């Protein structure tokens, strides 16, 4: 049994001078500083750049055409533009797989961590690796079981680009012009042709021994037709190699 000493009684007497305007100090003195529920910290999220494949229709007009770029602001509106100027800071790679939901279970994505190469096993958010894709090089794809083939086909290679982007003549979802400055963004490029097209920008910069952050890339889109007559769009990139962006400490 712990006996209260005279010294401790003296410290307790100090509490008779209670400063209600200094909660932190008083809570520490009274032993309740660690009893408050932890506050969930809200993370910082980047705007997401995507290609908008379908037009946004009004009652009798097209408000936003298909084949535009859209910039989704976290907890905010989405803006659209036919062209954009991207300043890439870096690229990373990951695997991604769409999982269809069922009754009571929503659709979701399985994603791996990002890395600077896909030549390694990457931990995914399902507790496995590579979204279930077998490790190593597959020499004979045709010899694999059909279930394994379907699994591999369902897993996307994703090139993740981070940097800043400026939409050219941006509009809101109603087609109204808006003022929008340069915005930090993340772009997950998963279409096979788009993966290669955007990758060519980084390949060209590497051959020039230039850093991505030193150059701007103009983004447009190119229409592709599906057998059923529908359209989808892939990025069209133009790297500005003549002008270099000055790097500052800001």
What does each model-found stretch correspond to?
Residues 244-250:
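Extended, charge-rich, solvent-exposed interface segments
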Residues 157-238:
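Extended serine/threonine-enriched, polar tracts that run as long, contiguous segments within proteins
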Residues 2-177, 226-244:
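OB-fold ssDNA-binding interfaces and closely related basic DNA-contact patches used
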């Amino acid at each position: 049994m712990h006996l209260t000493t005279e010294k401790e009684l003296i410290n307790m007497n100090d509490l008779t001078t209670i400063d209600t305007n200094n909660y932190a100090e008083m809570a520490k003195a009274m032993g309740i500083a660690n009893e408050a529920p932890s506050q969930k910290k809200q993370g910082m999220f980047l705007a997401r750049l995507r290609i908008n494949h379908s037009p946004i229709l009004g009652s009798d007009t097209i408000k936003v055409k298909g084949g535009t770029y859209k910039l989704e602001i976290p907890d905010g509106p989405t803006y659209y533009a036919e062209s954009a100027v991207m300043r890439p800071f870096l690229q990373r790679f990951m695997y991604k797989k769409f999982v269809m939901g069922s009754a009571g279970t929503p659709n979701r994505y399985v994603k791996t961590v990002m890395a600077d190469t896909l030549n390694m096993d990457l931990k995914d958010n399902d507790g496995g690796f590579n979204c279930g894709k077998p490790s190593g090089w597959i020499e004979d794809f045709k010899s694999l079981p059909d279930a394994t083939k379907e699994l591999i086909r369902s897993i996307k290679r994703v090139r993740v680009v981070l940097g800043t982007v400026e939409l050219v003549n941006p509009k809101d979802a109603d087609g109204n012009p808006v003022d929008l400055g340069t915005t930090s963004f993340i772009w997950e490029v998963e279409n096979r042709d788009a993966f290669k097209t955007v990758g060519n920008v980084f390949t060209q910069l590497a051959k020039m021994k230039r850093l991505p952050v030193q150059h701007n890339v103009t983004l447009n889109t190119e229409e592709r037709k599906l057998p059923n007559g529908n359209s989808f769009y892939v990025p069209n990139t133009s790297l500005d190699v003549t002008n270099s962006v000055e790097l500052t400490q800001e």
